[in-house]
């Protein structure tokens, strides 16, 4: 399993970091088999697998439940678990308790915290307590509703300068890596050049130190409409739907189960069953 130090080495050597967002045992298992460097158990599970229209409905219990499953599927991969909405906003004490729960109860190696500004003391406290932190800036889904919705961040000069300040504060607070979501590729490149910690982009261009996409988006699995920054590498929906339809057809036509998928009794046992009748 890689460590935080390994990710810094990868940045310095120009080796790209592969992060895959996965929410359960089978998806995390496949991500590990594919050679992912990091698996993110994101609160986007609210949208992707729980059917919510926002991540704000995801609870600590949800994150722990899915984090434990993902860890069982990928025991040898570095796992990052999201701090869900309001789990690190009320007090430093609450932040530490929730961060500790995520690490202890899921087996994750780190937590991810959205935002800067008022979140800086919380990031610093987590790191001082021995909990590795990934910061998340740009489009931050937990606060999208109050920041103008789901759109690209940092497109004007003032917003870009503010983000440059924010990422440096996150680094100084002790974050060991940074997720950059939906920002101009030029800004992402500038940030990546100016930071010593690795950057992982999602909708942030090719010049970040790594990339992250959601398992379901990569495979076109259960997603209705993918964002612009998503590239699908397979169409699992078509394959799975065909399999389910074939199953239903064979049940109705009595072609399933056939002898290959059925069990039998010995002839003498059948006689016992039938009371000696032939």
UniProtKB/Swiss-Prot annotation:
**SUPFAM superfamilies membership:** Phosphoenolpyruvate/pyruvate domain (SSF51621)
Question: What CDD domains does UniProt report for this protein, alphabetically?
Answer: KPHMT-like
User: Which residues hold 3-methyl-2-oxobutanoate?
Assistant: 43-44, 82, 112
Question: What's any one GO cellular component for it?
Answer: cytoplasm
Q: Where in the cell is it found?
A: Cytoplasm
Q: What is its EC number?
A: 2.1.2.11
Which GO molecular function, any one, fits this protein according to its record? Answer: magnesium ion binding
- Pfam families per record: Pantoate_transf
Q: Name one GO biological process term.
A: pantothenate biosynthetic process
Binding note for cofactor = Binds 1 Mg(2+) ion per subunit.
Q: Which residues catalyse the reaction?
A: 181
The record's listing under InterPro entries reads: Pantoate_hydroxy_MeTrfase, Pyrv/PenolPyrv_kinase-like_dom, Pyrv_kinase-like_dom_sf
Q: In which pathway does it act?
A: Cofactor biosynthesis; (R)-pantothenate biosynthesis; (R)-pantoate from 3-methyl-2-oxobutanoate: step 1/2
Show the catalytic activity: 3-methyl-2-oxobutanoate + (6R)-5,10-methylene-5,6,7,8-tetrahydrofolate + H2O = 2-dehydropantoate + (6S)-5,6,7,8-tetrahydrofolate
Q: Which family does it belong to?
A: Belongs to the PanB family.
Assembly notes: Homodecamer; pentamer of dimers.
Task of the protein: Catalyzes the reversible reaction in which hydroxymethyl group from 5,10-methylenetetrahydrofolate is transferred onto alpha-ketoisovalerate to form ketopantoate.
Looking up NCBIfam families in the UniProt record yields: panB (TIGR00222), PRK00311.1 (NF001452)
Name the UniProt record assigns to this protein: 3-methyl-2-oxobutanoate hydroxymethyltransferase
Q: Which organism is it from?
A: Desulfitobacterium hafniense (strain Y51)
């Amino acid at each position: 399993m890689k460590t935080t130090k390994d990710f810094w080495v990868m940045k310095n050597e120009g080796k790209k970091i592969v992060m895959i967002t996965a929410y359960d045992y089978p998806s995390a298992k496949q991500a590990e088999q594919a050679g992912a460097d990091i698996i993110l158990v994101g609160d986007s599970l609210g949208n992707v697998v729980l059917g919510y229209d926002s991540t704000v409905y995801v609870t600590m219990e949800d994150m722990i439940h899915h984090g434990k499953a993902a860890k069982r599927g990928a025991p040898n991969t570095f796992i990052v678990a999201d701090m869900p909405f309001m789990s690190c906003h009320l007090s430093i004490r609450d932040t530490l308790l929730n961060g500790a729960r995520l690490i202890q109860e899921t087996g994750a190696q780190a937590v991810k915290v959205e935002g800067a500004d008022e979140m800086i003391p919380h990031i610093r406290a987590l790191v001082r307590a021995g909990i590795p932190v990934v910061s998340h800036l740009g489009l931050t889904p937990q606060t999208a509703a109050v920041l103008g919705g789901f759109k690209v961040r940092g497109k004007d000069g003032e917003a870009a300068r503010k983000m440059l300040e924010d990422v440096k504060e996150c680094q100084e607070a002790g974050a060991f890596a940074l997720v950059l979501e939906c920002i101009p590729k030029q800004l992402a490149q500038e940030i990546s050049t100016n930071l010593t910690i690795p950057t992982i982009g999602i909708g942030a261009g090719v010049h970040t130190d790594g990339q992250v996409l959601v398992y379901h988006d990569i495979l076109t699995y259960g997603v209705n409409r993918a964002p612009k920054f998503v590239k699908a590498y397979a169409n699992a929906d078509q394959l799975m739907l065909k399999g389910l339809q074939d199953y239903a057809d064979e049940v109705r036509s009595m072609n399933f189960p056939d002898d290959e998928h059925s069990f039998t009794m010995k002839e003498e046992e059948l006689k016992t069953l039938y009371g000696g009748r032939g």
